[in-house]
């Protein structure tokens, strides 16, 4: 992969920086692993907006990615690496020895033709998946399960990874990129290495239209609205916020904790570092 600065042939392309990946497959994705993807445009079942700035965008198919990696002991060959419009990471198409094909999150350094395997006896090599109890302490991992057998939920985006810090009884401690240290059951699975496409965060979109292609709509400031639309709205002429920054629904926007899942608080050993 390489970062390419585009020629400033227009105002929209001036400053644009692309991530070019010549190893990615240029043809169509594997049809058997595609599903229809419907857009909610940020609305709930009542049609009310629950997530702002969503809507439009290019039509996409959902690529069914194997987050469980439960075909133990069966080697799989990497057929190709592909772009996935539904996530920041790239995906890899695996062909197992029994003929089945599955998509996985492509780890950093994975090459076409490499052989991957999952299970308790899998070697400690990038792309292989094992239960955490079989992974050496200090290993860099990604695609980590939070509940055994449920499938990977943590460290799945481009460039993401975690470090296995310790094992104590039936739980292990994992340090995430945010600085948070979590307890994870040792039967949970994780994949060796870190997620690829690590240069994704260095790209520059360049123009508003490129965000519209991705289904992201404009963000309007609260102070530019009417009082009925936002707590910061209204006033004669240009005015400040006149109160602490809040969301359109009155929730404080800075420093206010919104985590409600107290049931899993005991799984967090150390909170993430504040920016």
From Swiss-Prot:
Q: Disordered: where is this region?
A: 38-59, 223-275
Give yes or no: UniProt keyword Cell membrane.
no
Source organism's superkingdom?
A: Bacteria
What ranges does the record list as Basic residues composition bias?
50-59
Which GO BP terms apply? cytoplasmic translation
Instruction: Write out the GO MF terms.
Output: rRNA binding; structural constituent of ribosome; transferase activity
Q: Which UniProt keywords apply?
A: Ribonucleoprotein, Ribosomal protein, RNA-binding, rRNA-binding
GO CC terms on record?
large ribosomal subunit
Here the segments flagged for biased composition (Basic and acidic residues) are 229-244
Annotated Pfam families? Ribosomal_L2, Ribosomal_L2_C
**UniProt xrefs under InterPro entries:** NA-bd_OB-fold, Rib_uL2_dom2, Ribosomal_uL2, Ribosomal_uL2_bac/org-type, Ribosomal_uL2_C, Ribosomal_uL2_CS, Ribosomal_uL2_dom3, Ribosomal_uL2_RNA-bd_dom
Record's subunit section: Part of the 50S ribosomal subunit. Forms a bridge to the 30S subunit in the 70S ribosome.
Q: What does this protein do?
A: One of the primary rRNA binding proteins. Required for association of the 30S and 50S subunits to form the 70S ribosome, for tRNA binding and peptide bond formation. It has been suggested to have peptidyltransferase activity; this is somewhat controversial. Makes several contacts with the 16S rRNA in the 70S ribosome.
Family the entry assigns:
Belongs to the universal ribosomal protein uL2 family.
Q: Which NCBIfam families match?
A: rplB_bact
Q: Which HAMAP family match?
A: Ribosomal_uL2_B
Name of the protein this chain belongs to:
Large ribosomal subunit protein uL2
Could you tell me which species this protein originates from?
Bordetella pertussis (strain Tohama I / ATCC BAA-589 / NCTC 13251)
Tell me the name of the encoding gene: rplB
């Amino acid at each position: 992969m390489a970062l390419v600065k585009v020629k400033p042939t227009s105002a929209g392309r001036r400053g644009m920086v692309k991530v070019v990946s010549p190893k990615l497959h240029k043809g169509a994705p594997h049809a058997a692993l595609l599903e229809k993807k419907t857009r909610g445009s940020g609305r709930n079942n009542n049609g009310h907006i629950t997530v702002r700035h969503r809507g439009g965008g290019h039509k996409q198919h959902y690529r069914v990615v194997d987050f469980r990696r439960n075909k133990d002991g069966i080697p799989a060959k990497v057929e190709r690496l592909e772009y996935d419009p539904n996530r920041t990471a790239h995906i890899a198409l695996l062909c197992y020895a029994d003929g089945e094909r599955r998509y996985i999150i492509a780890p950093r350094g994975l090459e076409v033709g490499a052989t991957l395997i999952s299970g308790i006896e899998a070697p400690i090599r990038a792309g292989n998946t094992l239960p955490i109890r079989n992974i050496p302490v200090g290993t860099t991992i990604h695609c980590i399960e939070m509940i055994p057998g449920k499938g990977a939920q943590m460290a799945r985006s481009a460039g993401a990874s975690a470090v296995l810090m310790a094992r104590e009884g039936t739980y292990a401690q994992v340090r995430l990129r945010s600085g948070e240290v979590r307890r994870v059951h040792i039967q949970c699975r994780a994949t060796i290495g870190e997620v690829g496409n690590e240069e994704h965060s260095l790209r520059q979109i360049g123009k508003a239209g490129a965000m519209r292609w991705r289904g992201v709509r404009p963000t309007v400031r609260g102070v530019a609205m009417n009082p009925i639309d936002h707590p910061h709205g209204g006033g004669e002429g240009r005015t400040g916020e006149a109160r602490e920054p809040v969301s359109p629904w009155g929730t404080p926007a800075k420093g206010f904790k919104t985590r409600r899942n107290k049931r899993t608080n005991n799984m967090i050993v150390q909170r993430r570092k504040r920016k």
